Amino acid sequence: PPCPPTVTPPGEHDDTFSYGRRVGYTDGSCIGTKCEHALRSAGYGLAWGKDHPNNVAAPLEGPWQSSQRAELSAAVRMTEAAPGEPLLIRTDSAWTMAGGLLLLQGYRPDVRWESGDLWRRWAAALRGRGPAHQVFLQKVKAHVDESHFARGIITRAEAEGNERAD
């Protein structure tokens, strides 16, 4: 389920923990989206915090290169990277968020899903965590300006975390 608004425990950084959960930001992108798949180049990022040693920027593996696969790969990798603690994944991808919420509700992806291999991998990673190490998802606004901060749509810490994953 989506997380409640962030309240940071005293002494903890807003971009590191929320309600006792490790916070991570994911993002993916692809250049050449109007080209055939063989000419596309996609990658993803994982951001755990400013200058965190486990931050990742990596190319998307495999022949199918797309922004959606890159976004989804980031969420899968983040879930796999922190198996022993509760996790809050913040993503700007509505597609990843919607599918992730279905997985968290116990829905099992089938072979007909676009990028079904990644959805099944994520579902397995989520099932293997157990109730003490739950994953929560939160949609964050991409491409923000001052008006988004003024209206409370996104916090500066969330925007900075999303930019680090970008």
Which positions does each model-derived feature cover?
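Metal-dependent nuclease catalytic cores that hydrolyze phosphodiester bonds in DNA/RNA
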Residues: P5-T6
